[in-house]
A protein has these predicted regions:
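P-loop (Walker A) phosphate-binding loop of NTP-binding proteins
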Residues: 41-43
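N-terminal pre-Walker A segment at the start of P-loop NTPase domains
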Residues: 5-27
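Conserved lysine of the Walker
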Residues: 48
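Phosphate-binding P-loop
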Residues: 29-35
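Short phosphate-coordinating micro-motif centered on Lys-Gly-acidic
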Residues: 2-3, 11, 94-99, 104-145
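Short hydrophobic/aromatic beta-strand immediately N-terminal to the Walker A/P-loop
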Residues: 37-39
Length: 145
């Protein structure tokens, strides 16, 4: 029997376009209190950055086109209802590298969105979002709250 890694409330969604994925994230973010950590898990092209843009929109960010994957800068910071710390772990190889970024300084200071979260082990309370690609722009999105 396969053990479910989500020990809390888990919901599954199907989206059929980037817009639907964006709107799902936007709706989810409207209930945020300002200290959430969102771990985005999925392969290249799965929609992690689109989901991050939706979260930013849900938090009232005016120009979500600014939101881009921080693959080279590793962390982008955006202003919205709460500060948004957008982290990309694609290039990191081990847990200690995230500590070198000053990761812990951001905890509790705003919303933290982590792309490629599967690359590092996290021992903290977080919202896990797994994005799986289907045909065309279809996505299966599992959210563990």
């Amino acid at each position: 029997m396969k053990k479910n890694r989500c020990q809390r409330k888990e919901k599954e969604y199907l989206t059929h376009s980037e817009r639907e994925t964006f709107l799902l994230a936007k709706k989810l973010a409207k209930d945020f209190k300002g200290q959430e950590v969102v771990l985005l898990i999925g392969e290249l092209g799965a929609g992690k950055t689109i989901f991050a843009k939706g979260i930013a929109a849900g938090l009232g960010m005016k120009n979500v086109h600014q939101v881009c994957s921080p693959s080279y800068t590793l962390i982008n910071i955006y202003q919205a209802k709460y500060p948004i710390f957008h982290v990309d772990l694609y290039r990191l190889r081990k847990n200690s590298e995230i500590l070198d970024l000053g990761w812990e300084d951001y905890l509790g200071q705003g919303i933290i969105i982590v792309e490629w979260a599967e690359k590092i082990k996290f021992n903290l309370d977080a919202i896990h979002v797994t994005l799986q690609m289907g045909e065309r722009d279809h996505r299966k999105i599992t959210v563990c709250l």
